[in-house]
C-alpha cells in the first residue's frame, strides 16, 4: 500500500499514549521500575515523555510529510518501547482505557507540572486513567487557525467514532464506545471549543482565563481540537488511542485532508457558529461509535455515508497523500476497536471463561494488535 501514500503539502505529527503493565498479570503498574524512564529517554530521545500517571508514557513524533514516514517512525517506536518494557518486566499497551485496571491503583506523577494538575482538578484528574491519540497539522501563517478549526469542527465526531477503543472501564462494559471521552467531559475546557471566530478572539479568551486564575498556562485549554500553544498547528485531541497503528495513521490522514479542505475554501465561507447538531453527533459517537446515527445537512445518516460525504467534500489537493487513509477508514466502518473488543469478550464469555480471565485474554490480544505492521509493502 505504500505506493498510494503520495507526498502532501501539509506537514503533521502524531502523539501516542501508552499504559505500562506488569508483565505477570497485565494490570497497570503503580510505578515504573528504576531505570525504565532513563532507558526510554536513551532509546527514544526527545520523542519520549512521561505522563500524568506513573503507569503512562507518551511517544511524540518528529514532523512528517507523508503517512509512510509516520508508519516507519511509529512502527519502530512501538517496537522499541515494547522491547524496553519487556526488559524491565513490563508491557506497553496503546488503547483508550485498560479493560480491567482500577484507576485507584494508579500513582500520580510527582513532577511539579502534574502535581499542580492534580491539585487543581482533584478527583476528576485521579479518575482520568485514559490514553489518547493526538494529531498536529501545520497551518500556514496566512491562515487563521480558529477559522480553520470552526470549519473542521463539525466532522470531529466522525473521527471519534472511527477511533473508539474504550468500551471497558474497571473490568466492566461501560455501555459506551468511548468511555475515555465521557471521562474527558468531567474536565473543564476539554470538550467542544467555544465559537471564537478568529485567533484574536482566542487570544483574548486565553488572557481572560489567565487573568482570572482559571488557568495557569495556555496549555490548560484542552478542547477536543485546539490551536497548539507552542507550534503553528491545529491539534486534534478527540480520538482514543488506537491499538492498531494503521488505525491511528488513517485518522491522521483523514484529519489532514479535512484541514487541507478548510484551508482551500473561500475564507468568507468559513463558519463562525457551531452546527446545532454537533453535540448530538458527539454523543452518538461517544455512545455508539460507527453504529451511531448522525445528523448531517438536515438528515440522519450512518457513519459510512458520513465518511463518504467527508471525502467527497475534500478537493483533490486535500485528498493527495491521504487516499490510503480513506480506504482504511472504510474498513474501520465494519469493526472499530471498541466493537472488536466487545465481540471478542462476548465470544470468550460464551466459551465459558470467567470475567477476569476473559478480560486478561482481551488485553493479550490488544498487545498483539499494538505490534501489527501498519502498512503492507
Curated annotation (Swiss-Prot):
Domain of life per record: Bacteria
Higher taxonomy: Bacteria, Pseudomonadati, Pseudomonadota, Gammaproteobacteria, Pseudomonadales
Ribosomal protein found in the keyword field: no
Function: ATP-dependent carboxylate-amine ligase which exhibits weak glutamate--cysteine ligase activity.
Protein name stated in the entry: Putative glutamate--cysteine ligase 2
Gene3D superfamilies membership: 3.30.590.20
UniProt KW keywords: ATP-binding, Ligase, Nucleotide-binding
Biological process according to GO: modified amino acid biosynthetic process
EC number: 6.3.2.2
Catalysed reaction equations from the record: L-cysteine + L-glutamate + ATP = gamma-L-glutamyl-L-cysteine + ADP + phosphate + H(+)
PANTHER family xrefs: GLUTAMATE--CYSTEINE LIGASE 2-RELATED
Enzyme superclass (EC): ligase
Pfam families referenced in this protein's UniProt entry, alphabetically: GCS2 (PF04107)
A single GO molecular function term of this UniProt record: glutamate-cysteine ligase activity
The family this protein is said to belong to: Belongs to the glutamate--cysteine ligase type 2 family. YbdK subfamily.
Annotated HAMAP family: Glu_cys_ligase_2 (MF_01609)
Amino acid at each position: 500500500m505504500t505506493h498510494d501514500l503520495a507526498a502532501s503539502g501539509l506537514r503533521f505529527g502524531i502523539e501516542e499514549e501508552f499504559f505500562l503493565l506488569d508483565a505477570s498479570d497485565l494490570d497497570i503498574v503503580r510505578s515504573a521500575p528504576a531505570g525504565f524512564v532513563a532507558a526510554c529517554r536513551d532509546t527514544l530521545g526527545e520523542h519520549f515523555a512521561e505522563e500524568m500517571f506513573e503507569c503512562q508514557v507518551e511517544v511524540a513524533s518528529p514532523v512528517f510529510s507523508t503517512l509512510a514516514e509516520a508508519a516507519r517512525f511509529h512502527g519502530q517506536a512501538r517496537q522499541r518501547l515494547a522491547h524496553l518494557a519487556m526488559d524491565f518486566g513490563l508491557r506497553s499497551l496503546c488503547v483508550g482505557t485498560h479493560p480491567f485496571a482500577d484507576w485507584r491503583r494508579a500513582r500520580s506523577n510527582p513532577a511539579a507540572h502534574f502535581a499542580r494538575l492534580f491539585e487543581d482538578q482533584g478527583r476528576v484528574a485521579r479518575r482520568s486513567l485514559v490514553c489518547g491519540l493526538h494529531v498536529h497539522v501545520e497551518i500556514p501563517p496566512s491562515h487563521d487557525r480558529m477559522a480553520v478549526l470552526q470549519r473542521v469542527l463539525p466532522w470531529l465526531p466522525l473521527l471519534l467514532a472511527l477511533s473508539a477503543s474504550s468500551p471497558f472501564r474497571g473490568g466492566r462494559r461501560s455501555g459506551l464506545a468511548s468511555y475515555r471521552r465521557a471521562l474527558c467531559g468531567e474536565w473543564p475546557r476539554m470538550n467542544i471549543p467555544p465559537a471564537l471566530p478568529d485567533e484574536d478572539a482566542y487570544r483574548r479568551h486565553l488572557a481572560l482565563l489567565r487573568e482570572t486564575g482559571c488557568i495557569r498556562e495556555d496549555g490548560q485549554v484542552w478542547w477536543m481540537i485546539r490551536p497548539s500553544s507552542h507550534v503553528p498547528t491545529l491539534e486534534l485531541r478527540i480520538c482514543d488511542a488506537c491499538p492498531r497503528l494503521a488505525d491511528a495513521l488513517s485518522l491522521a490522514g483523514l484529519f489532514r485532508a479535512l484541514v487541507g479542505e478548510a484551508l482551500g475554501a473561500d475564507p468568507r465561507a468559513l463558519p463562525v457558529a457551531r452546527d446545532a447538531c454537533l453535540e448530538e453527533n458527539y454523543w452518538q459517537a461517544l455512545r455508539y461509535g460507527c453504529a451511531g446515527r448522525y445528523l448531517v445537512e438536515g438528515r440522519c445518516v450512518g457513519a459510512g455515508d458520513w465518511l463518504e460525504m467527508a471525502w467527497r467534500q475534500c478537493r483533490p489537493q486535500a485528498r493527495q497523500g491521504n487516499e490510503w487513509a480513506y480506504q482504511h477508514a472504510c474498513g474501520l466502518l465494519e469493526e472499530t476497536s471498541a466493537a472488536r473488543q466487545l465481540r471478542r469478550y462476548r465470544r470468550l464469555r460464551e466459551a465459558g471463561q470467567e470475567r477476569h480471565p476473559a478480560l486478561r485474554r482481551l488485553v493479550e490480544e490488544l498487545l498483539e494488535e499494538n505490534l501489527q505492521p501498519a502498512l503492507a509493502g
